[in-house]
Design a protein with these regions (language model features):
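Short aromatic-glycine motifs in intrinsically disordered, low-complexity regions
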Residues: 3-15, 74-75
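Catalytic strand-loop segment that frames the active site of acyl-thioester-processing enzymes
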Residues: 13-48
Length: 150
């Protein structure tokens, strides 16, 4: 049973106005891949926002995998640890333009994962950004956060 009526709310721990992806357009559980649509806005048009587009797409993938595994609680938060490589082939995202962001899980264990991510222009498929993201999602988020305060 979903925890809300919005498909993004079911798989992302983010809430408006911090949800930057518009919708999930493709999900392939066997390939460990998810594609999301993003419409660039004035507030989120700098090229470095590509990493957040990618991180939210990877989080949506992790959330979809959780749901397939029978998890019914709220979407679990994780942390972007960094990237080994970030290639940006544009200075700014074109405001109002549609982009497709694909995240594919390259590695995953109980709490860490690595995602190969690509951002393309929807109109012509041109690659405008790509990166390998590393993420950490603790099994016990409350315990982890409590330990950080000690």
């Amino acid at each position: 049973m979903p925890v809300s009526s919005s498909p993004l709310d079911d798989v992302l721990p983010h809430r408006k106005p911090m949800v930057l992806i518009d919708e999930i357009v493709a999900f392939d559980a066997a390939a460990g891949s998810l594609t999301a649509a993003v419409t660039a806005t004035r507030e989120w048009s700098e090229n470095w926002t590509a990493i957040e587009f990618m991180a939210q797409t990877a989080a949506a993938l992790a959330g979809k995998v959780d749901r397939l595994g029978g998890y019914t609680g709220p979407a679990r938060p994780g942390f972007l640890l960094g990237t080994r490589r970030l290639d940006l082939d544009l200075d700014r995202f074109e405001v109002g333009a549609l982009y497709l962001v694909t995240a594919t899980c390259a590695f995953s264990d109980a709490e860490t994962a690595s995602f190969e991510c690509v951002v393309t222009q929807a109109r012509d498929g041109a690659v405008v950004a790509k990166a390998t993201l590393n993420a950490y999602r603790p099994q016990d988020i409350r315990g982890f956060m409590t330990a950080q305060r000690e």
